[in-house]
Amino acid sequence: MDYDEETNSIGFEDFVDDVVENKSTEYPDLKTVVIDTYDQLVEIAKPEVIRMHNAENPEKPVKSIKAAFGGYMAGEDKATEIVLNKLWELKSVGVHFIIIGHVKQRTQDDVTTGQTYTSLTTNMSMRDF
């Protein structure tokens, strides 16, 4: 979640830490950060969750987010938690955030009335949407 060797660039966590630490000196005019896209940011966090689990539980290493922290969505919940915590750190120094997410229309039929209606959905987990 921190560093991309291919592009030689810092990641989301390093960026947030830098802004929080140096807001008044390096980023005095920074007001808003745009996250494009939230679903991708959560995907980026998943390997970090696996790393965290394996560091805390060396006797029971996992390779999958679904197995991390005991399973039953605990790994996915941890990914969401660390992303949101970083976003709230930005907010704590006065930097707001705009989150972009991909949505798509889905046509459904009401089982009771038989009427067709359209709803918005996403590729993300409904827990995050």
Where does each model-flagged region fall?
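Catalytic-core regions built around general acid/base machinery
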Residues: 82-93
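Basic, amphipathic N-terminal segments that precede the first structured/catalytic domain
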Residues: 1-32
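Catalytic P-loop NTPase motifs of RecA-like helicase/translocase cores
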Residues: 41-42
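A solvent-exposed, charged loop/short amphipathic helix patch at secondary-structure junctions
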Residues: 45-78
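Phosphate-binding/switch region of NTP-binding enzymes
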Residues: 96-129
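Loop/turn-to-beta-strand initiation segments
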Residues: 27-32, 93-99
